[in-house]
Amino acid sequence: MKPRMSPREKVAQMVCADFRFDLPDYERITAAVKAGVGGVCLFGGSIFDIASFVNGLQNLAKFPLLVASDFENGAGQQVSGATVLPSNMAVGATGSEELAELKGRVTAREAKALGVPWVLAPVLDLQVRADNPIVNTRSFGADAGLVTRLGRAFARGVRAEGAIACGKHFPGHGDVSTDSHLELPVLDDPGPALGPFRDAMEELDSIMVGHLVVKGVDAERPATLSSRVVDGLLRDGLGYGGLVATDALMMGAITKTIDAAEAVVRAAEAGNDILLYPADPLGAIDALEKALHSGRLNEGRVDRSVMRILDAKKRCGLTENRIADPGAVERVVGCDEHLKAADRIAEASVTKLRGEFPVRKARVELVTDGGIELTVFRDELDRRGALSRDSDVGVIALSSRVRAFQGKVGIDPKVLAKSRERLAGAKRIVAVSFGNPYVHRDVASDAALCVYDDSEASQRAAARALVGEIPMNGRLPVTL
């Protein structure tokens, strides 16, 4: 039964505020929770502070908070001390539904233990453009059938552990070359990109709508602000009845073109249930309340959104118990079982592109797009006696991450050239990529292998594969 709510309390339930542990503003989040926001999206933190912080917010809230985070690569993607799992593209290289479901289960177990039951994953975008600056290894791959199978399996694993998965970014963010954190991408037609959302929706308790214009559906508005996309295509066209959320409303694709308060109202008008990460949560509530009182926002629409939100909270157990068990953090988060799951996925993902292996001795040259040292990879090779300054084999370790707000992905050609100079005496070059596989297009090598992220598990797997301890059974899920 829906609790009694005032009009302001209803619209507040639609707002999901943000909190960043690296830039904490406790006064702001406390005010937002007291004002009745329906959820909070967390960034950063550690296993030592997340659960207690969430419990404090839950005790402050009149209604249970639906707490979310971007756990695309496991809870460790955001929370230090939690398990970092290999990327979706790594799972795509395995082709294994079993491993996709395992990733979903491990992610959800740790998320629930931390008090964060809304898992903002899986990414269901198709990775079809090498110059896409924001999807890349976040995707399972280029093939719609593969993405559907693995996305469904991941979501199934999340649901089995009592958490809520979120497929994103509807209607498909893969076939663009613009980062929506900075600008508004434009897509002619969703085409095959709709397939994973349509075919996986039975397993998805929520779907996130992306900030991009789809000219074939609505050439005038971003999908997040378009009733033709949200109500027309997603609800009526595909028949989706679950929770629908916007992508973060503070992103440049929205804020560069429209006032923040107006964007929140338009997103609600379009049919979104949850308005994620507005720049000003209190201002968002005020704007929604004003729109409701003026008749601009239909009360029946708001009621339907609130019912979906409350149903989601019930399904993940918040109605019965909103308080996370601190003991579960110690027992579950970052446990040996989960670390072994990460290793299992990583080892199954290693992909041989060309050439002969194993490599017994080599000089290693690190080439990165910044801030990544691949310490585990080096240490694992050193432990096996595989590092040698005198070797005539040179290993170029290529690390390239997808980062929001950068607008590009890849390694500076000048950095690549310098690394080749340092390996000038090598008779044989072996390229090993950690993350973005397209970097191999820019590197001439005699042999090459891929892992699809720089997690410790993937670094260990790459080292073991390089020296011949494990096979390379992964299959490249994109076209280079």
Regions found by a protein language model. Give the residues of each.
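Flexible hinge/switch segments at interdomain interfaces of large molecular machines
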Residues: 8, 79-82, 120-129, 170-174, ...
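A substrate-binding/cap region within the structured catalytic cores of diverse enzymes
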Residues: 95-116, 123-139, 144, 151, ...
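Surface-exposed, active-site-proximal loop segments in enzymatic domains
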Residues: 80-93, 129-140, 179-185
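Second-shell residues forming the walls of enzyme active-site clefts
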Residues: 6, 31, 40, 45-65, ...
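Preference for extracellular/luminal or secreted protein segments
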Residues: 1-36, 236-237, 256-480
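Catalytic domains of carbohydrate-active enzymes, especially glycoside hydrolases
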Residues: 29-43, 105-118
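Short glycine-enriched loops at secondary-structure junctions
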Residues: 19-23, 67-77, 117-127, 167-171, ...
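Active-site mouth loops of central-metabolism enzymes
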Residues: 13-24, 88-102, 181-192, 250-258
